[in-house]
From Swiss-Prot:
It comes from Burkholderia ambifaria (strain ATCC BAA-244 / DSM 16087 / CCUG 44356 / LMG 19182 / AMMD) (Burkholderia cepacia (strain AMMD)). Pathway: Nitrogen metabolism; urea degradation; CO(2) and NH(3) from urea (urease route): step 1/1. Belongs to the urease beta subunit family. InterPro entries: Urease_beta-like, Urease_betasu_sf, Urease_subunit. Its EC number is 3.5.1.5. HAMAP family: Urease_beta. The lineage of its organism: Bacteria, Pseudomonadati, Pseudomonadota, Betaproteobacteria, Burkholderiales. This is Urease subunit beta. GO terms for cellular component: urease complex. It is found in: Cytoplasm. One of its GO terms (biological process) is urea catabolic process. PANTHER family: UREASE (PTHR33569:SF1).
């Protein structure tokens, strides 16, 4: 085993099984690419991204940990979000929540 190596079983692994999800259409209205990481509170993503922010409160991208989605300028794409777990308190990011959801 190599330090940091992750060993998994063969086959497919379902991420976030049974957790509430939400599908949103996102448009990058800015002139620069925007990248959002797997555990970023999507509600607080870059203001150049146009989407239903109220619906996205308490959600993050439903993608593998450590990955990200890139939105090119002028691009519109549909993404799936998954509800935040744990104590459902959000601190940092853009400072729009700073406490329990």
């Amino acid at each position: 085993m190599i330090p940091g190596e992750i060993l998994t079983d063969d086959g497919e692994h379902e991420l976030n099984a049974g957790r509430p999800t939400l599908t949103v259409v996102v448009a990058n209205t800015g002139d620069r690419p925007v990248q959002v990481g797997s555990h970023y509170h999507f509600f607080e993503a870059n203001d150049a991204l146009s989407f239903d922010r109220a619906a996205a409160r308490g959600f993050r991208l439903n993608i593998a940990a450590g990955t990200a989605v890139r939105f090119e300028p002028g691009q519109t794409r549909t993404v799936e979000l998954v509800e935040l777990a744990g104590d459902r308190a959000v601190y940092g990011f853009q400072g729009k929540v700073m406490g329990p959801l």
